[in-house]
């Protein structure tokens, strides 16, 4: 009777736990959405031009002075939109890379995208005189040739070339994760070496413009660049979310995923290509922004688990939150100008990443210590019991 009751109530208990987990996940997602909205609102009021909250509200509804309206609508709003879109895109791309390669150290730049984009931008600025420095203090105070998109276009072309080259090489070895990582490191080193040679022969102005371009700067964003990034990120997000159950199957291993009907090689090729294109677009317009694609997937997986139906939207929201925080910090810490947001994300990300590594090591040591202590205690108890039994029998 007791066994029958246990078998009857056990499925109900599991359903209750699943419902509780689902509600917790929904609560965290709602909290992330609120965080994005609040931080985006705060970012509108932070900047080098000191405006009161009332003046910002007036400019937001186009009731302030012409200069204030121009600052809010032409500078700050495109910047906030870029932070939300780029943060989401880089974070989701990092999550997809980590899933495909089964490597927690993987990032959106694993395929050498950032290195190739930097080379393309340097080639445009140095070799084709694509940029010259202005006398302003802002990080984005240089103009890129006659067409402001020339350098971004060149950066995107070389980033895409790097993606296709690495994925083409990896198809020869059936997309083994180790081969992908090693190929990315090798090709990335080639792009870095080529960039160094270009900078060696550059003029002072060209070198300064090239180095400034590599700084991650949301101040370059315009409504047009935001629209391009939004379209690419949205297409990638929809594709990844539709394929979320296949990514969940991939977590069980290639053999298990294939037994469930997943075309593993095709999934890896398509998803890594799309994740790299998202990264290439963001880097081409905004420069190098590191650690977003590593930190945020780790945070969401620790909070919400590995189910991609939850972790994909959660990673997107957490990436937006991180980049909004970094952008706000860069404008608050800069003396009259914004610091490179890429430097802020690295300063925030490096200690966090080290903390994850050390916590994992300490947790592993603690587990071994507890297991060893339990085995010793078990051995002592067994030996004591044997002595007691032997004493009674004698």
Pin down the residues of each PLM region.
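Alpha-helical transmembrane segments in inner-membrane proteins
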Residues: 2-374, 387, 394
């Amino acid at each position: 009777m007791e066994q029958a009751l246990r078998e009857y109530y056990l499925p109900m208990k599991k359903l209750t736990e699943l419902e509780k987990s689902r509600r917790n996940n929904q609560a965290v997602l709602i909290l992330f959405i609120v965080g994005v909205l609040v931080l985006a609102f705060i970012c509108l009021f932070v900047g080098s031009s000191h405006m009161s909250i009332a003046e910002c509200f007036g400019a937001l509804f186009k009731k302030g002075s012409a200069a204030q309206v121009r600052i809010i609508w032409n500078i700050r709003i495109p910047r906030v939109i870029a932070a939300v879109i780029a943060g989401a895109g880089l974070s989701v791309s990092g999550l997809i890379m980590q899933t495909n390669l089964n490597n927690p150290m993987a990032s959106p730049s694993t395929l050498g995208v950032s290195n190739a984009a930097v080379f393309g931008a340097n080639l445009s600025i140095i070799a084709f005189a694509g940029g010259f420095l202005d006398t302003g203090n802002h990080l984005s105070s240089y103009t890129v040739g006659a067409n402001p998109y020339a350098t971004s276009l060149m950066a995107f072309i070389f980033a895409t070339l790097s993606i296709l080259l690495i994925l083409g090489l990896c198809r020869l070895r059936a997309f083994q994760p180790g081969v992908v990582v090693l190929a990315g490191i090798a090709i990335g080193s080639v792009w870095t070496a080529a960039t160094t040679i270009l900078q060696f022969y550059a003029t002072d102005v060209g070198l300064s413009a090239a180095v400034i371009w590599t700084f991650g700067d949301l101040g370059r964003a315009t409504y047009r660049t935001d629209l391009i990034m939004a379209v690419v990120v949205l297409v990638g997000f929809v594709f990844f979310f539709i394929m979320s159950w296949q990514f969940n199957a991939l977590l069980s291993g290639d053999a298990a995923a294939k037994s469930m009907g997943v075309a593993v090689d095709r999934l890896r090729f398509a998803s890594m290509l799309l994740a790299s294109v998202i990264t290439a677009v963001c880097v081409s317009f905004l420069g190098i922004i590191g650690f977003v694609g590593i930190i945020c997937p780790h945070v969401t997986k620790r909070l919400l688990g590995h189910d991609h139906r939850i972790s994909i939207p959660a990673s997107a929201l957490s990436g937006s939150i991180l980049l909004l925080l970094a952008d706000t910090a860069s404008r608050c810490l800069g003396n009259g100008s914004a610091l490179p947001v890429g430097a802020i994300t690295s300063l925030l990300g490096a200690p966090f990443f080290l903390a994850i590594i050390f916590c994992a090591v300490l947790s592993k040591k603690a587990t071994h210590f507890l297991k060893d202590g339990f085995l010793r205690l078990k051995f002592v108890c067994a030996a004591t019991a044997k002595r007691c039994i032997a004493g009674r029998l004698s």
